């Protein structure tokens, strides 16, 4: 297996469970761009993409004790990212002030 394979992910996950924050940083570095690209297919706002990607990793870290390893780590992380993006989009639709604020920023940028 290569240094990028699931065996390495399983080892990193186990190290994180034992308190090794550096191992979690390695998982973030490994998957951050992939998660950002995934979220960008669902969300057009670049800042929101970054926020959702960051929230994905926060949620993954908090849920790591429940990760059973029945699927690849990235598969699990992918699902967290999709659910986090869906939740963010639903919140945007529910709160018209957020949408208005985002539109105002877009209008300001267009007139500058």
Show where each model-derived region lies.
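Structural recognition of an alpha-helix C-terminal capping motif at a helix-to-coil junction
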Residues: 51-58, 71-83
């Amino acid at each position: 297996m290569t240094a990028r394979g699931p065996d390495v992910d399983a080892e990193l996950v186990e190290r994180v469970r034992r308190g090794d924050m550096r191992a979690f940083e390695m998982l973030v570095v490994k998957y951050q761009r992939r998660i950002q690209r995934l979220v960008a297919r669902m969300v057009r706002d670049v800042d929101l993409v970054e926020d959702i990607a960051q929230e994905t990793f926060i949620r993954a870290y908090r849920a790591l004790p429940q990760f059973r390893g029945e699927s690849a780590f990235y598969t699990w992380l992918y699902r967290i990212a999709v659910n986090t993006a869906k939740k963010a989009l639903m919140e945007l639709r529910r709160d018209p002030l957020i949408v208005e604020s985002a539109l105002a920023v877009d209008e300001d940028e267009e007139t500058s």
